[in-house]
């Protein structure tokens, strides 16, 4: 893990920190867009002096995600479930923390995926590195009704700095990965349609803590919104953990607040109730 120590000395004081997951939290997958009321809430939070953090399992700089990053324009970014943390992600891109998966683990995962016909890999810039390419295409067609992948041999991934991988498939494959790779966190997506794969020891909560330290924001002034398993540690870390109304049951049961679903303006209304916008 690399940590950058050259941090900006004159950071603007913020009232508090508000963190948002992307998929099924800000982003409505039924419409393929961030809900307008959530974007308005983010805008008002910034105007009211709060630090807005996007905390996602995605690599927000790949071609499938970068437009969402630009739309949200957060003050800070926790991406790939805390394996990379940045301030000013659309400007200076100051890196606070960056974990790179070991080549040995990456090689074993690729081999396991090929031997067991499990689709896993990642997208970097305009290239897609995956085992079982046909499964990935079908996965795309099932969930976004299109696929424009630019596949390159998955072995080329060993030449890249990789922080996390994506598994495309059902519960059985996720369980096989969890059983055979105890050093991995396997975070299922909220609809059991795949999972994030990353080395244990990293989480969105760890990333938020780093950001809060830089901005000198106490945990008492933090709020986090999420919908799935990879948001659980973030919810526990924040003073107020909010589950959106369309979250999985487990997250809603544990949350401090359960908002309305995102398509019913849940994020906006909750922040208004909290007196933050």
What is each PLM-predicted segment?
Residues 1-20, 217:
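Non-catalytic pre-domain segments flanking phosphatase-related domains
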Residues 14-31, 235:
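Asp-based phosphoryl-transfer active-site loop
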Residues 22, 58, 227-228:
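Active-site metal-binding loops of divalent metal-dependent hydrolases
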Residues 36-136:
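Active-site phosphate-binding/coordination module
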Residues 53, 78, 223-225, 242, ...:
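Hydrophobic/aromatic beta-strand patches that form the interior of the parallel beta-sheet core
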Residues 72-73, 81, 180-184, 237-238, ...:
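Short, structured coil segments at secondary-structure junctions
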Residues 112-233, 237, 246:
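Conserved acidic, metal-coordinating active-site core of Asp-based
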Residues 237, 242-277:
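Asp-based, Mg2+/Mn2+-dependent phosphohydrolase catalytic module
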